[in-house]
């Protein structure tokens, strides 16, 4: 228990929260914010807005932060869904005690922003010119319906990279479907090589599909940043978690 307490304390200490959206904007666009301490990582100086709600998007942002990017996690006023995911410190299901949430958001700053309000959307548009990357995991078309989709945000910052990580990608017949972990495994064919021959297939332990989506998202974003630094151009990265799983399944055949 002492080790668990120490770990939770360290994780919490690495997260800085701003709850007032106007304060968020002031801090991100101020000269002081632009001159954040150097992390001496390969992505030092890169600024990222993480709008994701799931494991894959959060893990993508976590990896970018680990490599030195300045990542700000923007959550709805009710908090990101990962806050309600255990295990919890002391077995207390409190939104500030989800060890999973803290682990996925290590090395990030945090703020609340309500994208369902005009004020929140306007603040997001004013923040975008000051960042290099936006990560999101909403249903395809959700942000566009509110006027803050890729086409809307790239109008504010022509070199913006948006990384969208969803169960089935931005296009295609399944794009609007929800996809839980076991669905990603089954449709990505990885369950065809799990379990014992002649018996029912088994789901792998943990959230490997989500981690694969986040890992591919971070790798693709890093490549896009290389292009951005050379050409000044941004792009919209479309990551399908199921396709990431399928790629892994192909590699094991």
Language-model-detected regions and their locations in the chain:
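N-terminal helix-loop segment corresponding to the beta1-alpha1 unit
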Residues: 17-233
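Substrate-binding/catalytic subdomain of NAD(P)-dependent oxidoreductase enzymes
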Residues: 224-253
